[in-house]
């Protein structure tokens, strides 16, 4: 009886090791351009068979663009804050939504940050098991002494 229990336990562990963690985002509003509203994924590039949507600009280039184009931080060199931007990229590599998820203390700053992210239009769609899918990307940012950096 103990041997059967051990065999069952071992087989369950083996099955779990082959399964894959997949996070689906719950989209409550209708977003024009989404390929499949019920299957928008938060992909994790470090997991097998998951590839995040990729922007043509590197994160360091996006940071540089934010610091160059967001007038609020250029005018407020002692300003400290943090926030988060989310972008939904459809299965065709098109940005269908860009918004602030965690707002900063300034609506003006939020608007300027989103406006910069909206200019990022060249994307490769995310992939799950080799198939192009709708996906969401998040960028947490911090502002220290008027300089924006990603966390």
Language model features with spans:
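Charge-biased low-complexity segments
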Residues: 6, 18-151
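Sec-dependent N-terminal signal peptides
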Residues: 4-13
